[in-house]
Design a protein with these regions (language model features):
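Domain-scale recognition of functional cores that engage charged ligands
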Residues: 1-300
């Protein structure tokens, strides 16, 4: 988001200024404020770190950029150690206590003593310190459940349970393949639906029925029948299209919007977001891992 904004400001400075576009540059400072708010009680000036898998991770530049913009440490699991009930960072001056970690590592890898024992990315003993309330983790372990696409079907009920209110925006009709009736409908209408694996991301494990061949649909039908819990389906939604420069021409391409929200003492919604664009003509897959791109998003 921040990179796209900088490119547009340099490329079209006059258009940008005349349009009075709301800034997104304060996101790192807002993130830092949120992380500071999460610090354990009685910690006045918390030491904060961004926990990254390392230089070979595809998002390493983002991790490095955010840590620099916030003025906090960028650390890997090998840079941290649990000692005397706290998490410490190894420095040239000895151990330095860490109070908050913005983790960019999946749950399974954050502590080999609790989760995957073969993990070299996390910190042994981290979860014990977390349970004692001596370090804050963002996002908290377990929040990755929201990545399970099946959860989407229950969002209206979740909103109703926690707020006593109805959802403002209706859900896209969603079919959960573990339900016999839903599964029968999905298998009978594969040519009309988008089918997604519950725990895949990046555009993988997905079937766009109207664009798939009969053989591809048959293969997916077999997967659904074998592991119904792992699949959900939705109608094929017509994504918005925007003009996109392709070579020396301007053509329409499908896009979606990924907003950014921070939840600290207050809720911050970034006045912009990441507009992801499918660069392949006719494609509905906007993920960067599948050849997608991104665009700056203006809120006036």
């Amino acid at each position: 988001v921040l990179e796209n904004r900088q490119v547009l400001k340099r490329t079209f400075p006059q258009v940008f200024e005349a349009s009075r576009v709301r800034p997104v540059d304060d996101y790192p400072s807002q993130l830092l404020e949120m992380l500071t708010d999460l610090a354990p009680q009685h910690v006045q000036s918390p030491t904060i770190g961004v926990l990254t898998p390392g230089i070979y991770n595809s998002a390493y530049f983002e991790h490095s950029f955010l840590s620099q913009q916030m003025g906090v440490e960028l650390v890997e699991g090998q840079d941290l150690v649990v000692s005397e009930g706290f998490v410490h960072m190894l420095t040239t001056k000895g151990l330095k206590r860490v109070d908050v970690l913005y983790r960019r590592i999946d749950d399974d890898f954050i502590d080999p003593a609790v989760f995957r024992p073969d993990s070299l990315l996390g910190v042994r003993g981290l979860m014990g310190v977390y349970r004692e309330g001596r370090i804050a983790l963002a996002n908290a372990p377990g929040t990755g459940i929201a990545d399970d696409k099946v959860i989407y079907a229950y969002v209206p009920e979740i909103i109703r349970y926690y707020t006593g209110e109805e959802a403002i925006l209706p859900n896209v009709p969603t079919y959960i393949c573990r339900n016999d009736q839903d599964r029968a409908y999905v298998l009978a209408h594969l040519d009309q639906l988008v089918v997604k694996a519950a725990n895949e991301s990046g555009g993988y494990g997905m079937l766009v029925g109207p664009h798939a061949s009969a053989a591809e649909r048959a293969a997916f039908a077999a997967k659904i029948s074998a592991e119904p819990r792992n699949y959900m389906a939705q109608p094929t939604i017509s994504l918005s299209r925007v003009p996109t420069i392709v070579g020396d021409r301007i053509e329409g391409r499908h896009v979606d919007l990924r907003p950014y929200v921070l939840f600290g003492d207050e809720i911050y919604v970034q006045p912009g977001g990441l507009t992801r664009v499918a660069l392949t003509k006719g494609s509905l897959v906007v993920n960067s891992s599948q050849g997608g791109g991104s665009k700056d998003t203006w809120v006036l």
